[in-house]
Design a protein with these regions (language model features):
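Phosphate/anion-contacting hairpin/loop surfaces
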Residues: 1-182
């Protein structure tokens, strides 16, 4: 089975970070190519929140890419198969002026054609490019995927990251409860 990388529904809106776009953009992350940067990606949050509760999550949302905690990053970095497929980029998180280190951003290094276009519902993102990028209102994943993988970027919708049963099982075994598998 294939699952979309999705945060738990109880992730509060007040925990959405702002992605500081400097040398790496969200578009760069959608290319499935290794990125070389000396500087970490920066995420900021300036709201009155419970920092302890916020930092109890393992995956976080932003107006750019999602990013993961030091705990989840360490678990994944120790998985040799996973790090062959996904680059983990350094990220610094700034919460109300206080910097936190050790966070990572997923950069899947390959695309996977995985959307069943007959069962999914989409429309062209640009009306003058009917065969170009699509905006999906309903995504149905193909059931005939035989490729052995951990995480990939969806070829038909590059903003979508998909994960495999292997990664789902890894998360369950390591008590990662912030990711919804649907």
């Amino acid at each position: 089975m294939i699952y979309r990388l999705k945060l738990t529904d109880d992730y509060p809106d007040s925990y959405w970070f702002q992605f500081k776009k400097e040398e790496i953009s969200i578009v760069d992350l959608m290319q499935c190519q290794e990125i070389h940067s000396k500087n970490p990606l920066i995420f900021t949050l300036n709201k009155k929140i419970s920092e302890k509760r916020l930092l109890s999550y393992n995956i976080f949302s932003s107006d750019g890419p999602d990013f993961i905690s030091l705990r989840l990053a360490t678990l994944l970095e120790n998985n040799e198969e996973f790090v062959k497929e996904v680059q983990l980029l350094d990220a610094t998180v700034i919460i109300n002026g206080q910097s936190h280190y050790g966070f990572k951003v997923f950069n899947p290094l390959h695309f996977l054609s995985c959307i069943d276009m007959d069962k999914s519902e989409s429309r062209p993102l640009l009306s003058y490019l009917p065969d170009g990028p699509k905006s999906f209102t309903k995504m149905v994943f193909r059931q005939d995927i035989t490729k052995d993988f951990w995480m990939a970027r969806c070829k038909e919708n590059t903003s979508c990251i998909v994960i495999s049963d292997k990664l789902k099982q890894f998360c369950i075994e390591n008590n990662i409860k912030d990711i919804v598998f649907e």
